[in-house]
């Protein structure tokens, strides 16, 4: 039986249908938000996967082009690999729900959200995120939700729930928040230098809306929800645990307190290997149990060391930033480079400038758009001393690249001020935590080295959290071990003026306003420290671009002149391109961008365009080319694409019988523009520039 539920969300109807489609899935729902329709399903395997020490959750977000009435391009004519937007949305679905499955639950769980119809003003990503919570909550899958999600914008200081596409253009904030009725679970934000207080107020505003949606979902579950499956978690053998603890004594604690990462890992591995060998000999076939106990003890010991003793794995204070060093201009042929080192994390970011035709065209189910500023993040296996197959960017790499891109976006100059396409690539060379925020810092240095006039410098910092009962410890600039064993990963990027990007993921059941407020203030202090260290290498963008970068010149012509510049079938513009070697981009408003390999080519191309759009002026003298000879005169091209007639009577003072007696096609002659008639036809004279012959009376008087 079909059940329909409805509430208002952002002033628009939000409708949930249960039992209409996909009934063989353990949980499913059809979300209708305006004209946006999203089908979300949740399925789980009947049996857990043996030998796993992680929860095998997969979330997929499918964009179907029929949702916006499009047929896929290319030869195959069907949707292929997910777009970057689809990958990022899949991550948004995954992150808030992952912490809410029972510990020890290792069944395969798959959530699939399929966009069936798309309304630009009703975001399908939010519909998919809420739908995933509903599908899991009404199913028999042991999900400890529900969660809910909203998007928040800010216009003139006012917060807006799920802003429309038009409102997003005017908004200084793009925030997505997920949470339960009691706590925040996930944050993704881009902002135009907002203060910590403004961001925090926006998060709390979002949480109030989340509470309403959660209550709505709880009502749905009370009516159509299925009983949850029982999770029988494998219990740790307490006797074996005691034996391992006694065997280790203080060895594990001493190994963890080794400050160098490589040496610490080696010491921990040595202690673990010793314990595994001992207990394998004592209890044959129980190595897996001993390994699980060791992993648990490493986590417990590290967290206890931080919370009780105030000692971090590398002996830093809780709010201390690792040593920072920076360098710019290290690759001779690159347009800009920045090398950023923070502790054992090292990122090299390279800037490449191109003409506007190098901008990325975005063609999905959203509005068609172009992206002239791009950031790509690469995390090769050697950065952590490992091996793995390299088969294109992972979801994590795409997500980190998008975060760094968002952090710098408000500082990128407009197309009018800097008419270039900009691509940044961050190569993580060594990683011990906070590589995405090191990429933010490296990108700032690289852009400035390339001469991109960014408005202000941007830096990023990753914050961590260890929460044991009522004891809360917030860590600045977390390293890899603290990230893996901690309860929160909060990334904050911004300038001296405010926050430009933020991302938060947690592994516990949520955090409150007090923790968020403390973490943001601690992040602000750390960010300002990092910005000051970055200024030791470069303080402002370089005045001149690299000699290897294209030279882009912007000129403005009247829109009516665009046709003349292009010419019939592109004849005129192609001639300029062929003669100068430049790339030329023309926009409908009359803006022309000339990208040249060198300054001389740029000058020639601009000069040719200016001649084309220049209007002939009566009384001006021009050097023109004879392009056609007739019985009654000659046609002379005085400007590119503009020709006039020199009548036979205006060729010379004396009588001319045949035009060919004076001129030949291809001759260059000087002419004076005498008139432009109402039909736009141009009258020229050669005679007006020739000296008048002496008269008979003048000759006799001499």
Curated annotation (Swiss-Prot):
Q: Which CDD domains match?
A: KH-I_PNPase, RNase_PH_PNPase_1, RNase_PH_PNPase_2, S1_PNPase
Which Pfam families has this protein been placed in? KH_1, PNPase, RNase_PH, RNase_PH_C, S1
Q: What's its catalytic activity?
A: RNA(n+1) + phosphate = RNA(n) + a ribonucleoside 5'-diphosphate
Q: Which residues participate in Mg(2+) binding?
A: 483, 489
User: Which InterPro entries is this protein grouped with?
Assistant: ExoRNase_PH_dom1, ExoRNase_PH_dom2, ExoRNase_PH_dom2_sf, KH_dom, KH_dom_type_1, KH_dom_type_1_sf, NA-bd_OB-fold, PNPase
Q: What is its EC number?
A: 2.7.7.8
Keywords, in A-Z order? Cytoplasm, Magnesium, Metal-binding, Nucleotidyltransferase, RNA-binding, Transferase
Please verify whether the record's keywords include Transferase.
Answer: yes
Q: Which GO terms describe its molecular function?
A: 3'-5'-RNA exonuclease activity; magnesium ion binding; polyribonucleotide nucleotidyltransferase activity; RNA binding
Residues covered by the S1 motif domain: 619-687
Q: What is its main location?
A: cytoplasm
**GO:BP terms for this protein?**
mRNA catabolic process; RNA processing
One GO cellular component this record assigns the protein to is: cytosol
- The record places domain KH at 550-609
Cofactor(s) this protein cannot do without: Mg(2+)
Q: What subcellular locations does the record give? A: Cytoplasm
HAMAP family on file: PNPase
Family from the record: Belongs to the polyribonucleotide nucleotidyltransferase family.
Function in brief: Involved in mRNA degradation. Catalyzes the phosphorolysis of single-stranded polyribonucleotides processively in the 3'- to 5'-direction.
Q: Which NCBIfam families match?
A: polynuc_phos, PRK11824.1
Q: What is this protein called?
A: Polyribonucleotide nucleotidyltransferase 3
Q: Say which species the protein is native to.
A: Alkaliphilus metalliredigens (strain QYMF)
Source taxonomy lineage? Bacteria, Bacillati, Bacillota, Clostridia, Peptostreptococcales
């Amino acid at each position: 039986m079909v059940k329909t539920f409805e509430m208002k969300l952002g002033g628009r109807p939000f409708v949930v249908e249960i039992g209409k489609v996909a009934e063989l899935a353990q949980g499913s729902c059809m979300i209708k938000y305006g004209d946006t329709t999203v089908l979300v399903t949740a399925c789980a395997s009947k049996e857990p996967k043996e030998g796993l020490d992680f929860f095998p959750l997969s979330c997929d977000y499918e964009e179907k082009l029929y949702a916006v009435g499009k047929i896929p391009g290319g030869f195959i004519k069907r949707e292929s690999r997910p777009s970057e937007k689809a990958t990022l949305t899949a991550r948004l679905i995954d992150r808030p729900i992952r912490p809410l499955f029972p510990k020890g639950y290792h069944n395969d769980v798959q959530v699939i959200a399929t966009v069936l119809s798309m309304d630009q003003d009703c975001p399908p990503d939010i519909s998919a995120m809420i739908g995933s919570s509903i599908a899991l909550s009404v199913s028999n899958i042991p999900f400890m939700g529900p969660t809910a999600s909203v998007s928040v914008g800010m216009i003139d200081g006012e917060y807006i729930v799920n802003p429309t596409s038009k409102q997003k253009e005017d908004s200084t904030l793009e925030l997505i928040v997920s949470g339960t009725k009691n706590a925040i679970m996930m944050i993704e934000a881009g902002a135009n230098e907002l203060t910590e207080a403004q961001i925090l107020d926006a998060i709390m505003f979002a949480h109030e809306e989340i509470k309403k949606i959660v209550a709505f979902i709880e009502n749905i579950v009370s009516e159509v929800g299925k009983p949850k499956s029982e999770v029988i978690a494998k219990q740790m053998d307490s006797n074996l645990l005691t034996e391992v603890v006694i065997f280790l004594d203080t060895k594990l604690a001493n190994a963890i307190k080794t400050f160098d990462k490589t040496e610490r890992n080696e010491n921990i591995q040595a202690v673990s290997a010793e314990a595994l060998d001992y207990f394998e000999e004592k209890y044959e076939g129980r190595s897996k149990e001993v390994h699980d106990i060791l992993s648990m003890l490493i986590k417990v010991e590290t967290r206890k060391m931080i919370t009780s003793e105030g000692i971090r794995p590398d002996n830093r204070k809780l709010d201390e930033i690792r040593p920072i060093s920076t360098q710019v201009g290290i690759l001779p042929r690159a347009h800009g480079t920045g090398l950023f080192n923070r502790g054992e994390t090292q990122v090299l970011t390279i800037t490449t400038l191109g003409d506007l035709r190098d901008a990325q065209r975005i063609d999905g189910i959203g509005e068609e758009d172009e992206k002239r500023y791009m950031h790509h993040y690469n995390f090769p296996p050697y950065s952590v001393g490992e091996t793995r197959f390299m088969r294109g960017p992972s979801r994590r790499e795409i997500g980190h690249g998008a975060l760094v891109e968002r952090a710098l976006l408000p500082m990128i100059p407009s197309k009018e001020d800097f008419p270039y396409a900009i691509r940044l690539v961050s190569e993580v060379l060594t990683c011990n935590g906070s590589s995405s925020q090191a990429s933010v810092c490296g990108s700032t240095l690289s852009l400035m080295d390339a001469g991109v006039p960014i408005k202000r410098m941007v830096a990023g910092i990753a914050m961590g959290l260890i929460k044991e009962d009522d004891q809360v410890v917030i860590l600045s600039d977390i390293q890899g071990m603290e990230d893996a064993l901690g309860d929160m990963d909060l990334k904050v990027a911004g300038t001296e003026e405010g926050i430009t990007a933020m991302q938060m993921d947690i592994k516990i059941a949520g955090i409150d306003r007090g923790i968020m407020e403390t973490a943001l203030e601690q992040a602000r202090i750390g960010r300002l420290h990092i910005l000051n260290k970055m200024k030791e290498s470069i303080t402002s963008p370089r005045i001149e671009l690299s000699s290897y970068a294209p030279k882009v010149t912007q000129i403005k012509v009247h829109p009516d002149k665009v046709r003349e510049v292009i010419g019939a079938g592109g004849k005129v513009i192609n001639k300029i391109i062929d003669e100068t070697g430049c790339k030329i981009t023309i926009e409908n408003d009359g803006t022309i961008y000339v990208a040249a390999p060198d300054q001389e080519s740029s000058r020639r191309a601009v000069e040719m365009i200016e001649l084309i759009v220049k209007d002939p002026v009566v009384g001006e003298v021009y050097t023109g080319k004879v392009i056609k000879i007739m019985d009654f005169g000659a046609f002379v091209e005085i400007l590119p694409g503009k020709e006039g007639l020199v009548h036979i009577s205006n060729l010379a003072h004396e009588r001319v019988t045949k035009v060919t007696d004076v001129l030949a096609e291809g001759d260059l002659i000087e002419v004076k523009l005498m008139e432009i008639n109402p039909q736009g036809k141009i009258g020229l004279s050669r005679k007006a520039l020739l000296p008048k012959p002496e008269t008979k009376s003048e000759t006799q008087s001499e």
